[in-house]
């Protein structure tokens, strides 16, 4: 396994649809206050704001844990235990210079390396075209995380979407609405980043959850989504620009039959950790189980 990514959870073959997933929101699933108090988080945030005054804080869902139901059991197959966190807390924990120490201290104090970390839950998509290519984007060098690297479409589900005009509280966030936001957010990210019409996208299937070890184990839920457009049609939509076009500088495609061998190619080193997690889960859950001997991935030329 690539050291930049670890798998927290792998869904059953094919992936799980929305109706097979439950979410439990509780303050018990929030991060623990830092051992020396949270003043360090405030100091980091204020320093970042001075250097980047355009930054703004926003609430995020925090993944505490996830449990699959026993094989063959009826009802929902996956339970997500979620708390609330924020972008500010992410910068002050997962992205702080003391992140490794916080993980060690969490293991010592609570038996959980993530106990003191914000761990905002992200989403990503293995997006397949009608002519059997997966879609990749080259991240802009202006973005804060993984600038210039190759990614899959993705982002974050937003608690604020379920509480417009208010401050999200655990008791106000019904589990099924949270699951719906999780699934709809990955579709919205595809629409915004690749500029695709929503009606061209299938309902997502959850492949699993991967941790980004370069940001102290921040988790991302990775999905499989099919698009009814060909790769060339997707390229044309992307080129016409979308709401988040500034976040990437180019689009390219890898044949799905060759994705199994992606780890053995030079392209793998260009993938950001979240994209690596998405591809590993795609290969294990949705991709060809045979992993037939294939050559290097056939790429449609990048822009």
From Swiss-Prot:
Binding locations of Mg(2+): 189, 193
Transmembrane segments: none
Record domain Nudix hydrolase: where: 118-285
Cofactor(s) required for function per UniProt: Mg(2+)
Entry keywords, A to Z: Hydrolase, Magnesium, Metal-binding
GO molecular function: GDP-mannose hydrolase activity; metal ion binding; UDP-sugar diphosphatase activity
Consequence of substituting residue 156 to A: Abolishes enzyme activity with UDP-galactose
Entry's Gene Ontology cellular component terms: nucleoplasm
Entry binding sites for substrate: 56, 87, 139, 144, 151, 156, 158, 274
Metal-binding as UniProt keyword: yes
Impact upon substituting residue 189 to A: Abolishes enzyme activity with UDP-galactose
Keyword Metal-binding carried by entry: yes
Domain of life: Eukaryota
Chain location of the short sequence motif Nudix box per the record: 175-196
InterPro entries (UniProt xref): NUDIX_hydrolase_dom, NUDT22/NUDT9-like
Region annotation (Disordered) ranges: 148-168
The reaction(s) this protein catalyses: UDP-sugar + H2O = UMP + alpha-D-aldose 1-phosphate
Known EC number: 3.6.1.45
Protein family membership: Belongs to the Nudix hydrolase family.
Function noted in UniProt: Hydrolyzes UDP-glucose to glucose 1-phosphate and UMP and UDP-galactose to galactose 1-phosphate and UMP. Preferred substrate is UDP-glucose.
Protein name: Uridine diphosphate glucose pyrophosphatase NUDT22
Organism, as annotated: Homo sapiens
